[in-house]
Amino acid sequence: MSRNVNKANSVLVRYQELQAAETGGYQDFSRLKRPTRINKVTKLDEALRWRNELVKEIGQRVTQIHDPSLNESQITEINDELNKLFQEKGRWDFHIRNKLKGPDLKKRKQLNTTGGTLIDGKRYFGRALELPEVQKLLRESKEQREKERSGKEKKAELQRKIKRWESTLKDDYFVGNNSDELLEYEKKRTGSLRSTIHSSDRDPSFVIPNFDVPSLKDVELWLVQRRKNELKKQLGL
């Protein structure tokens, strides 16, 4: 009997809510299912109320996932639900801000709706961080950060060594150096060489002797004669 009474009361409440919604009165959003097609919600106040219900559900799930009596399967399931709820929250925030020209709710920090540890694009809350596979991901993430930090430190140390080394180099190391001392030396040395080679007030340092260049026929005769002399020497003539 009581079951029928509760069912009748539930139907009556739903009927009263529908009547109130039609007349612009109070509507209990907590008793209704959130719309899956967010873009169909065209009123800002309605969208904000749906989002508030979503935030409440996120808070409930965050509290639930800290329950010490949950097994690993239940923890994983709740954590997956939380990730889906956060994705839905992001869609509501975008719709309210960009489509309905409402406030930017992403900048607001609300209790139990932020936090968690983000690993490879997924959030982990409460006891989900104790799961073996999550612990493995945390270790791998830590090792990767240490490698990146070590690589950056090595690169920075190498840059410091290069700067110290460059500071010890003299001007004559660099090609195209234009230091005053080097330019002055080049000027004097160039003048000295020019005066030695192209001097007009003295004889050249050496004279190339004049001689007749032998013709091809002369060379051939010389080779034949040399061959004859070698044969005579071998024969003892």
Swiss-Prot record:
It holds the Pfam family Isy1. GO terms for cellular component: cytoplasm; spliceosomal complex. Its main location: cytoplasm. InterPro entries: Helix_hairpin_bin_sf, Isy1, Isy1_sf. It is found in: Cytoplasm; Nucleus. It comes from the Eukaryota. Keywords: Cytoplasm, mRNA processing, mRNA splicing, Nucleus, Spliceosome. The keyword Chaperone does not apply. GO terms for biological process: generation of catalytic spliceosome for second transesterification step. Associated with the spliceosome. Belongs to the ISY1 family. Involved in pre-mRNA splicing. This is Pre-mRNA-splicing factor ISY1. It comes from Kluyveromyces lactis (strain ATCC 8585 / CBS 2359 / DSM 70799 / NBRC 1267 / NRRL Y-1140 / WM37) (Yeast). The lineage of its organism: Eukaryota, Fungi, Dikarya, Ascomycota, Saccharomycotina. The gene is ISY1.
